[in-house]
Design a protein with these regions (language model features):
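Sec-dependent N-terminal signal peptides
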Residues: 4-12
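Acidic/histidine-rich, surface-exposed loop or edge segments in extracytoplasmic proteins
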Residues: 58-73
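Charged, amphipathic alpha-helical segments
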Residues: 78-105
């Protein structure tokens, strides 16, 4: 048991040196217009899914998957949510995210994530398979997701506009 703990500690200390990355993103041009984050394992449904965008009438909508669920739930979002996203992008310099992250060693199973932030004139895209960017940058994604989750937590069943299986949801 001690040996396993020691190996786990060594691997966690070496993980910053074990990530490869490629691609780059532009600095944001204009205000954000949509946000998407997905964290998935090897299952059919994502572990975490958030999407923030405006509907055809211009109203802000938040789509998410409930914990361990299979349905996408859509609720109204606050009008200032894009201000929060823009501040996090600037504060954490999310435009420094690389397009792709992966481990130096081959891993045949595991978890993947991706995020896309669209702005008026361009977008930031990043994703990874069993690897993440440096924590000081990834903290910006965590900050956005935490804010979205706080809005979701403050909502009620009466706020639900749509509930649909993830496989059928039109993204």
């Amino acid at each position: 048991m001690k040996l396993l703990l020691t190996i786990a500690m060594i691997l966690s200390l070496l993980s910053p040196f074990g990530t490869k990355s490629s691609g780059k993103n532009p600095k944001p041009d204009g205000a954000s217009t949509s946000y998407e984050f997905t964290y998935s394992g090897t299952m059919m449904y994502p572990i975490t899914f958030y999407e923030v965008k405006r509907d055809s009438a211009g109203a802000v909508r938040i789509a998410y998957i409930e914990h361990n669920g299979t349905d996408v739930v859509v609720i109204p979002g606050p009008e200032d949510i894009f201000d929060h996203i823009d501040r996090a992008v600037a504060q954490y310099k999310l435009y420094k995210l690389k397009n792709s992250y992966w481990p130096r060693m081959e891993i045949l199973d595991g978890n993947g994530w991706h995020t896309r932030i669209r702005f008026q004139h361009n977008s930031i895209y990043s994703g990874g398979s069993n690897a993440r960017p440096p924590q000081k940058i990834y903290a910006g994604i965590d900050a956005i997701n935490s804010y979205i989750q706080s809005v979701i937590d403050a909502s009620s069943e009466a706020d639900v506009l749509l509930r649909q299986d993830y496989q059928e949801y039109d993204r």
